[in-house]
Amino acid sequence: MQAVWRYPVSSLRGERVDTLALASDGVRGDRDYLLVDLVSGEIAAPEKIARWRPALELDARVTSRGVLISSKDWAMMIDDAELDSALADQFGFRCAIRRAGSSLLTNVGEIKLSPRYLASPVHLLSLRSLSELSELLPEAIVDVRRFRPNIVVDTRADENDWVGRQIAMGACRGTVTEKTKRCGMTMIAQTNLCEDPEILRTIVQRRQRCFGVYADIDSEGVISVGDTISFDER
């Protein structure tokens, strides 16, 4: 494992960490929270809706006190009473960060805030794929942050060949279930990265829109940077 990442709030920038705790329902502390419009109940979708794109100018990371949300101008704990106001200034409308699975009273009634991503608990991406995309787009900044993986694997193997195979990751075991279909999040501008539609266009044209793989977790445990990843023999 070359790197591991966690994203405490869906649609916000995540954090590169040393270890991750994996469970059957995914990465502990990953995408536990959502960014939501307090009036309509709309969940943030920067890849589809332009008004949510400032989400990628915000960082979320786990501290000993809880989740810390920060911009270039401020930093607040997720339970800070002033956070909703700071987010409204950031986006230009009333919005907030709330826990996935909780309920929210909006102008259209009480709604349950469902998690955005249900495809698979863990997302893996190889350095090989990043390198190949960089070769196809020599003028682009092919940065891992555009693709939001949990695990970056240092391998020259083709990750598409992992689908359907059992995988051992440190103390954990899982099953690679499917290729990762890509959306507009890959091309959106974020801190130190410009908007670049060619990234998604090239993935669609050269990789059938897929970049990375998803895996289900069969046995829980903790993984760390530097752990070995292996697969069952076909």
Feature locations, PLM:
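Metal-cofactor-dependent catalytic cores
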Residues: M1-R234
